[in-house]
Amino acid sequence: MKIIKRSGTEVTFDIDKIVNAIRAANLEVEESSRLTDRQVVYAAQNVAEACENAGHTVSVEEIQDLVEDEIMRLDCYEVARHYIIYRYVQSLKRQKNTTDDKILSLIECNNEEVKQENSNKNPTVNSVQRDYMAGEISKDLTQRVLLPQEIVDAHNEGLIHFHDSDYFAQHMHNCDLVNLEDMLQNGTVISGTLIEKPHSFSTACNIATQIIAQVASSQYGGQSISLTHLAPFVEVSRQKIRGEVARELEELGVSASAEKVREVVEDRLRDEIRRGVQTIQYQVVTLMTTNGQAPFVTVFMYLNEARTPQEKHDLAMIVEETLRQRYEGVKNEAGVWITPAFPKLIYVLEDDNVYENSPYFYLTQLAAKCTAKRMVPDYISEKKMRELKLSKGETAGNGDCYTCMGCRSFLTPDRSGNGFNNVANALNYDPNKPKYYGRFNQGVVTINLPDVALSSHQDMDKFWKIFDERLELCHRALLCRHERLMGTLSDAAPILWQYGALARLKKGETIDRLLVGGYSTISLGYAGLYECVKYMTGHSHTEKEGTPFAMAVMQRMNDKCAEWKAASDIDFSLYGTPLESTTYKFAKCLQRRFGIIPGVTDKGYITNSYHVHVSEEIDAFDKLKFEGMFQQLSPGGAISYVEVPNMQDNLKAVIRVMQYIYDNIMYAELNTKSDYCQVCGYDGEIKIVEDDGKLVWECPNCGNRDQEKMNVARRTCGYIGTQFWNQGRTEEIRDRVLHL
């Protein structure tokens, strides 16, 4: 059995250390108040048994909590008091330097917590380690200097989660929609070099990847770009190629019909589109940003975003090539085609591509084929989104359709009625269009809903009182995020604030006016709605006895966001948090505070946002229909999914699910398995098995358990992860049931 030390390193459990610790405290009290040797060993054995049954790799802090409980259970309160004093003294000693051990264990690749924190970072690589080292320093500064103690304590106890404290020391924001159109059409500056409007599609793609890398290095959250912004350069290349063909024919003294010339031009154009799309795919997965990872970038594919029929035709060619190349995948170091994590693709389901007789249905068929093999694209319903996202003056069904920022964070609709009066000085400003590209999110703080419920002891009046108190705590924490960004100079990230990605401010100008008035958002996250409802009502939120309470919880959070927004002119918005490593942290905190409660705290994870519990039997269509209700109440960020088996031979069923998404839910994805064993060549699902109390990945064909010799891709938190996960998230992945 393994345990995790405070430094994050994983070591073998040693019962003798528990025995010795209890004996040391025992010797500090009078003989008449001491435990017998038999009681000492009995207590240690009970602790060991509790660790075995915990369902996850326990930490030193958890073990010490168990020791305290055991001593007090034996009515030796004086011994327990001395043990608590000993822990307190050791804690004070550790506070003198909170980072050295963590950083040293990180460098030596012994820090298990860091190894499993981010499923898209490889913590053995020098550049990643440097980012993690900086992150540990930032976390330390955040907790000791930058945040009020009440926020720090609430975060450490798992009442709330203050996200991305490893970047909070700097003046950095979360995620955004890159105004790629402005940068490509009107020029930008990268690393002090002027980049003018490109003269071909392939050059535009190359510049786009440089912009993606620069943006990723200037923020900590995801970014999104639209293929629509690249579409005009298809016509630029078409005209350029047409001129080249004409010159070649003239030089050869050959004449050709207009139709033949058109065929040659279009063939060469498609080849250039292929090369341009390939540039984006390979650059994105091979670039290393200052965050120690490939850029978290989402590529948006929305045909109705095109301005003219010709541009829409050209955009369709780009979308087609993007889907074809993603279906193919990328080669791993052994030359085997595998599923890449990035870029994330979002395909908009529209009236002209979703049904069999629609003109762009061939793209939807290709998207279905790609999803069945590579788990992308994800799907946004134009129909449902235009019902929900209403800018000033718009009516239901005539609203806006736009991409999320990264994996799931959505901007609030444009409430200005004039594109925010071009507060960002964009050169592609149109006062008659709602403004989305160039806007961003300031950050997230998440409330632990199961903790609110458990703290109330099933007393409804007490629940709402505690809920309001915790929400106000989140509010104060979010204001800390907002105030950290206030006063930030545009010089802090020129690519973002001066050269068009988000704004074109002057040097030395602050970004303050972009933080209010609705231009940017700030997110109240939530997690564990299922566990919260289960504890308070005894029912899943999918059952009629639990659904009304779940909806009331969601509405209360929306009401609070509206209240805070009215008071401050900051766009607070409710966000379904994509817990990755934090799901494990919250679960451990709940077990520490409330013990093991069947159906509520008996897992190493809690359920993301409003989702149906991963182990609950429900079919794909019922799940999407049910969760669609909650997406309406999660306007700042939401994504739903269905787990499916290998669907490569049943694409009609995939398309049926996609059509159901179009009619019933704004944003959803299909999860399948796409793994490869480098030892035996097995191509299928790598299984999760238990080994000495720890969950490990194992090839079902040859038994290989070496994570360095397998490629595993699983959807976690809206992105595809490929670097493995902590024990809590791994347990959640194991427990997922199929919905189709």
Feature locations, PLM:
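Conformational switch/transducer regions in large eukaryotic molecular machines and scaffolds
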Residues: 14, 694, 716-719
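Amphipathic, well-packed alpha-helical segments that form the structural scaffold of globular domains
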Residues: 23, 475, 479, 530-534
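Contiguous, well-ordered alpha-helical segments that form the cores/surfaces of helical PPI scaffolds
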Residues: 301, 522-535, 555, 715
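Charged, amphipathic alpha-helical regulatory modules used
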Residues: 1-109, 734-739
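Long insertion/accessory domains within large nucleic-acid-processing enzymes
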Residues: 701-740
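Conserved catalytic cores of very large enzyme subunits
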Residues: 89-92, 96-518, 539, 543-705, ...
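Metallocofactor- and cofactor-centric catalytic cores in central/energy metabolism, strongly enriched
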Residues: 273, 277, 281, 534-535, ...
